[in-house]
Regions:
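Short beta-strand-to-loop acidic/aromatic patch adjacent to the donor-nucleotide binding site
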Residues: 61-71
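Conserved catalytic core of nucleotide-sugar-dependent glycosyltransferases
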Residues: 80-162
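C-terminal catalytic/acceptor-binding lobe
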Residues: 165-228
Length: 228
């Protein structure tokens, strides 16, 4: 049986600082980590693309890239993931099956609401309890949200797909760029239901770094890099 590798990058110096920052809703508090190889990259100052590429290897395993402020609340998540990977090459929790590429380049805006798939839980503003954001029924998608990305490591390695480290926005656009690159290589992307709580409600403002990442992404679209 192949191992499961759970990878996250955090600007926190260690797990204690991470848990102090996010409380119980963080990746290190996740359920059913027994037998899972947890790879936490602390004090991270590199782009997520650069970190993630080091884990795309020629090995028989399941790799999951997850945000540090995400808590896996589902005790059966590893089994659900294996089942989903029998159907899809890359699995996430939320995404969209069709997209019109335009600004602002956020998957849930570029993808019309009727094409949204999956669901994610979020922490209430008062930090007491959680609520569910239900995007739509589970299914195949064109774009996946980067909160949770899972795949058969060897299969992705053999496809030649990697994250594009040239993106100037270290924590943005890596997911939609990766999704479209996977599609151009004929890999199937889809969502599955795994109960995960995200400690963030998403992007709150368009920073200069985010704007530079958007320009980078739009240029790749213009140059025909994704075959869409």
């Amino acid at each position: 049986m192949s191992k499961t590798v759970l990878v996250f990058a955090s600007q926190s110096e260690n797990s204690a600082e991470l848990e102090n920052k996010y409380g119980k809703y963080c990746v290190t508090k996740s359920l059913n980590l027994d037998g899972v190889c947890v790879e936490g990259i602390y004090s991270n100052r590199q782009s997520l693309s650069k970190v993630y590429n080091t884990f795309i290897k020629d090995e028989n395993s399941i790799t999951v890239f997850i945000h540090d402020d995400a808590y896996i609340r589902d005790p059966d998540w590893t089994e659900k993931l294996k089942t989903a990977l029998d159907k899809y090459d890359v699995v996430g929790l939320a995404g969209g099956s069709e997209a019109k590429i335009n600004a602002p380049c956020l998957w849930h805006i570029m993808c019309p609401p009727h094409t949204h798939r999956g669901c994610v839980s979020h922490v209430n503003d008062d930090r007491k309890g959680t609520f569910v954001t239900n995007f739509g029924k589970q299914g195949r998608v064109l774009m996946l949200d980067g909160l949770f990305l899972a795949f058969n490591t060897k299969k992705l390695f053999d496809s030649g797909v990697k994250f594009d480290e040239s993106c100037p926005a270290g924590y943005h656009f890596y997911d939609i760029d990766f999704s479209l690159t996977c599609n151009s290589k004929k890999l199937k992307l889809g969502t599955t239901y795994i109960d995960v709580v995200h400690n963030s409600h998403g992007l709150r403002k368009f920073t200069d770094e985010w704007q530079s990442g958007q320009a980078w992404f739009m240029q790749k679209v213009t140059d025909g890099k994704y075959n869409i």
